[in-house]
Regions:
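C-terminal motif of bacterial Sec signal peptides marking the signal peptidase cleavage site
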Residues: 17-21
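Extracytoplasmic/periplasmic substrate-recognition and gating elements
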Residues: 74, 78, 166-168, 257, ...
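Short, solvent-exposed loop/beta-turn-alpha elements that line the ligand-binding surface or hinge
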Residues: 123-137, 200, 204-207, 222-247, ...
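Extracytoplasmic/periplasmic solute-binding protein
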Residues: 147-151, 156, 182-234, 280
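Conserved N-terminal structural module of periplasmic/extracytoplasmic solute-binding proteins
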Residues: 4-8, 22-113, 126, 264, ...
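Glycine-centered hinge/linker elements that transmit conformational signals in sensory
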Residues: 185-186, 231-265
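Hinge/lid segment of periplasmic solute-binding proteins
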Residues: 109-160, 212, 216-218, 303-307
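Short helix-initiation/N-cap motifs at beta->coil->alpha
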Residues: 83-92, 178-180, 262-277
Length: 331
């Protein structure tokens, strides 16, 4: 779980490196769906260029404003940070790219997002930040052209309340496969009145929650099909492992804190709050949830673990967490 803290630290370090490599105009302009704060500037002798960063994460706006101010104070290079409203990044980016002072630093979410902006991207192959990567897996590239650099690596799986799991008579060592997970979850459901908790938090289909299943869970059948077929891209999947996807979804909704009929209205906050209240053992989410689950009145590190989303495919005992990024910086 402490990987979240490491990711944030790396994010800050990468930010300083990336800002140092940017030039051009910073006149971003106002939009109705963004926060635009220009850092106070102190021009240093010999300072050239400026930076306009279109930020994706509203919850990190203040940190970026602080970093921009500190960078300007140190270098004299003016930095503008505009933060798009939640869920409006792509539309804001389209609007800003049409202006004379387009962003010098922006974000794409991977190959799909890159398709729209490839022609705008500076090749980072010879940059200092690319040279600092420990693996090309952290770069968004085609052939020898580097279009983007991952700036945070995160993991997701099943977050486990170990205390509740042990109260049900199990430990995480008892769960090494989908069959094991199914056995434990269904046993907890059968004894839920006695135990006082369910197996899984609600798998809400509200927009604040459904991405966990429409994107994160849906990655698994695609990943395993790619692995089986030895490919890295395809125009259409064959659906080899869609039955596994359905089986996992059925396990979630039939062993949950709520009736499946209620899922359309359940939110991400509902799922998190159920886990915090000790209403369920398992919570599908990722390392970014660490701060929400710990701290004052929350869990300790000893209370929590994260296990893979076992899918009934391959060598499950050696399966790891789903790890990667959908956050790439482009210049």
């Amino acid at each position: 779980m402490n990987k979240k803290l490491l990711a944030l630290t790396l994010s800050g370090a990468l930010a300083a490196s990336m800002l140092a490599g940017c030039g051009g105009s910073s006149n971003g302009g106002d939009t109705s769906t963004s926060t635009d704060t220009k850092a106070d500037t102190t021009e240093a002798s010999g300072a050239e260029g400026s930076v306009y960063y279109l930020n994706f994460k509203p919850e990190q706006d203040q940190q970026w404003q602080d970093l921009a101010k500190a960078y300007t104070e140190e270098t004299g290079v003016p930095v503008t940070v505009v933060t798009a409203a939640s869920g409006n990044y792509e539309t804001t980016l389209m609007s800003e790219m049409g202006k004379s002072g387009a962003p010098t630093l922006f974000q794409v979410n991977g190959p799909v997002g890159l398709a729209n902006w490839k022609d705008y991207c500076y090749d980072l192959a010879g940059s200092d930040i690319y040279g600092q990567l420990t693996s090309d897996n952290y770069a968004l590239k085609e052939d020898d052209t580097v279009y983007g650099i991952a700036y945070v690596i995160e993991s997701y799986g099943l977050i486990v309340n170990k205390t509740l799991l042990e109260k049900a008579g199990y430990t995480i060592d008892d769960i090494q496969s989908f069959a094991d997970l199914k056995k434990v979850a269904e046993d907890i459901t059968a004894r839920s009145s006695e135990l006082g908790f369910a197996a899984f938090t609600s798998a809400g289909m509200d927009g604040s929650s459904d991405w966990r299943f429409k994107t994160h869970l849906a990655n698994l059948p695609i990943y395993f099909e790619y692995q089986t077929d030895g490919i890295s891209s395809t125009d259409a999947i064959k659906g080899t492992y869609l039955d596994n996807y359905r089986d996992m979804w059925d396990l979630y909704i039939n062993n949950s804190t709520c009736d499946p009929k209620e899922l359309s209205a359940k939110t991400g906050d509902d799922s998190r709050n159920e886990f915090l209240a000790g209403d369920a053992v398992f919570f599908q989410n990722g390392s970014w949830e660490y701060a929400n689950l710990t701290g004052d009145g929350g869990y300790t590190d000893d209370d929590l673990a994260m296990i893979p989303i076992y899918f009934g495919v391959g060598d499950e005992a050696n399966q790891g967490l789903c790890t990667g990024t959908e956050n790439y910086w482009c210049v």
